[in-house]
């Protein structure tokens, strides 16, 4: 009997080390950043079983077999639609400003579609203004309303949006809503989905959280886009979730969330539409394409207006696209660079680009929240401040709530607004959306918003920062080491 237990023990030990060796080899063979690989190896060797389970669940990008098959099947029809769109050459910009030309060229070559002109943009800096405009657009909608959000939380002014959508559906408008399962978990636990479906609104739970399928699809892959489309000619996108900030996370101790949305009329709504259709088909298996270009685009052909490129990122889209776009933007800066983000955990390449910009004389400012709703990200962000301050970057800590806006302004001309945080999850993992605007007028509007943020912020003093308690430095470095996993 003792021999049997001895054999079993040796088999368990052998299997244990074989499993660790196998996962280690898998990490080393995957093409990933060295800091990320080292962080995962550290977790696995310090907490072997926990680390292995965590890596198999969250360490690799698994879209899921069914979604991957749908993505493969939908591409031919999507490619055909894009070819038809490109036949309308008059809507595409042929010239860009000097600071924007490299980025627009990158986007066109990698995504296959150039930036479109003739768009009218309106920046909205408050939740109330956004909802007021949205309710008016929903009331005037005649054909279709599509929405995708990470978080939809009933209550406050959101109830008016729900009622307006129900009214639209009852008068024959096709309404489709795609909501992330994890972000909108409270919504799906309440009666609102059934209420909306009864009225004829299609409500779909995207990327459902299922622990039993954790090894088949990455559970922390999230649908982080925020897009509203109305009659395929009006679009909204930005950082705002469908939540009333007066009611959302009031117990987090960070104040109300501050967001930025853009309302757009013009051909870029068509570009956003095809992205929404891809997300819809990937989640439901149902094909849904925007109206033909000759119906949808022609009314907006004009020489005036804003030139916009759309960057869609996430599984199934050009790899590292948003990361490359941010790097290109930073390296294009010659005079000024202002970046706003709630979560700042940049890649080594992005951090180096930002520091290099400051060191070559660019006026670089980064605006982040003073208090963060994520303790882990908050500490990890602080770990980068010393290097940024040493390079001459100005760091502003917003003190009037949780600044949730995601924006980049380069030389007052090139603007990036959307859903992308300057952290690893947005750069490498989640489904995100970004508008790239080449327009000095819009840049001036965005600069005014950023100046308002700065006026409500505290400039981080380099000397005071160097004198912070030693225990804080230890905590910062600890989270810095694990920042590739956040």
Swiss-Prot record:
Gene3D superfamilies xrefs: Endonuclease Chain A (3.30.870.10)
UniProt-listed Pfam families: PLDc_2, PLDc_N
Record membrane topology: Multi-pass membrane protein
Gene Ontology terms for molecular function: cardiolipin synthase activity
Record flagged with keyword Chaperone: no
Family designation: Belongs to the phospholipase D family. Cardiolipin synthase subfamily. ClsA sub-subfamily.
Protein name, per record: Cardiolipin synthase A
Organism, scientific name: Pectobacterium atrosepticum (strain SCRI 1043 / ATCC BAA-672) (Erwinia carotovora subsp. atroseptica)
Gene this protein is translated from: clsA
